[in-house]
C-alpha cells in the first residue's frame, strides 16, 4: 500500500517548489492529460496501462518527455516544470527508492551539467537543505570532469 502524504506537508513542499521555479521564469506544464506513450519512458516492464475511449494507454510514469518537448518548442523560455502522479508497476520495488504510486515534481531547463548543478544548489538552499548533508555532498562529487575521467 502506498503511504499517505500529510496534506499540510505536501502543500508546503509544492508551494516552495512552485515559487522557486516560477520566480526564475519557468512555466508549469500540465502533463497528466496528454495521452501519449511519452508518459512512459522507464523500464517497459514497469508500465501499467489503462483503457480510455477504446484505446490502451500507459499510466503516466513521468512528465519528462513533455517538458523536453515544451523546451524544444519554446526555446525562449528558461525552463518548464510539472507536478504529476507517477505509476510504477514494479514487481520487486527497490526499498527506499520510491513508492509504486507517488507524486513527482520534475523540471527541464536550458544549459548543461554546470547550469543544472548550480540550479540544484540554489534549490537546496531555497528549500533550507544544508549543502553539508552527505547526500548533497556526494552528488556534488559527480561533476562533468569526473565523468570524463571514468
Where does each model-flagged region fall?
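Single conserved hydrophobic/aromatic residue that forms the stacking wall/gate
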Residues: 142-150
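A conserved active-site cap/scaffold subdomain adjacent to cofactor or substrate pockets
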Residues: 98-136
